Amino acid sequence: MDIVRERYEIAIERIKEISTENISNEKYQEYFSKVAKFILKLNYVKDEIESGRLKKYTTEQLEQLNYELYEDIYKENYKTSLANPKFACEELGEEYGRILCYVYKKIRDLIGNVYRQEIEIVTLRIELFIELFYYFENSEELEYRSIEEAVYSFEKDNTEIFVDDMVDWRVNPKRTFAVDIVMNSDLNDIRYLYMYGEHIGANEIGMAQYLNSLSQSEIDSLAHVYTEGYRKGFVIAGKDLSIKDTVDIRYNIGFERIIKSAILDFEKMGLKPIIYPLGYGSTMCNKQYWFDHKFDEALYLDKAFVKRKLEVAKQAFENRKDLALKMAGPAVIEIFGENPFEPESKKEAYKLTKEQQKLSAGYINEYQRIVQEHIPGDQRSFTIIAFPIPEFGHNFKEMFDATVKINTLDSEKYEIIQNKIIDELDKADYVRVVGKGDNRTYINVKLHELNNPEKETNFENCLADVNIPLGEVFTSPVLKGTNGILHVSEVYLGELKYKDLEII
């Protein structure tokens, strides 16, 4: 038995005790008992996976297990869930409620790690939970500062493990968890959906069933539009795809038949698939849960943490510089048709201070610079294609078919049409955009001056390569001279719905 597994077994034995142990403060006892029992459920899943029994489950058994793992955050249960910061603070007090809610959320995040059999990360999180229990076990000596320091030290001390693992997933083709599900499962048997460990709902099941109703030639045609757009992106930009070995594939669970065909297409281009945990996913069973925990890093985000995280990220990429250099870029299948989400902003949820917002933005910028250094932008490309999901409504199938038609329009025909649009736009000094109806947009967009209009253009003719479908001409405007009002009555950005967004 290796040292990590030994630590895990010791931790699980302690969790069994905690699940039934009495502590002096009853409100904390209920919290630790509930979370400990959830950890034991994860341990049960781990055993079922390692023994091979999980693959023999019926569809009904898999559906029930998936329900048990996610039921606490379903909308109908979330109001009284300890994963809800508002309820946690009501039950445990505002001081300890928020931080214990955060700890429970991180334990819940381990579902995916368990399915991927990432025992070290699972062990670390369980050990932190046990450490915190010891503090609350002696509640007369309990100090919030001790709890906060324990969590902060844990996050900072283990940054190397977490970030190194994240980077490895993104560039290492030997991490084949999702690839194995796609390539080795019987995709006509929807039980495969439950092997990811993600929440599986009507969208994932409905999408898989609909794609299973299509012929293989129809599936191959859809996949080819996606992969050919990726290949064309390199050709049009004059970039050499032959020097690359891997492609970053991203999709929503349920699209596996298309992804399997696409992987075979990419292999013909000499590309091996990389599908990392955030590259696949399912539609959220409760977006309020996601929103409530969106800024949990406020608990520990400071200069020292950011500095350490960037050091680790840089070293992680440096250790894999050959793998990183071989990454060709992302091939993304996006989805649309989800019901609108208007979040409730809760005072109990963590929020970033202005200083932390600057630190977060600085981290993102510096991390992107590290990525750019190891996966140079002038050597990579991408493609994005989107499809509706069953949540779109009763006419989902009609919309899916219409989307396919739009995604497969004749590029040669529309290249001529879009070039004529560009020829006219290139004659302009600026473009005036005026909103229709209730839209208040009235903006002049300044264009770059062309020194040689016969050979130069301000606009990109987008023809179903990096952005699918075609039908777009775009430019980068001159900021000086661009002025007016840009108004959007309704827009979705990062899972959130914004109303009457206006920039002056």
Q: Which role fits each region the language model picked out?
A:
Residues 1-483, 493:
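Active-site bordering "gate/hinge" segments
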Residues 478-504:
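Long, well-ordered mid-to-C-terminal structural blocks that present hydrophobic/aromatic surfaces
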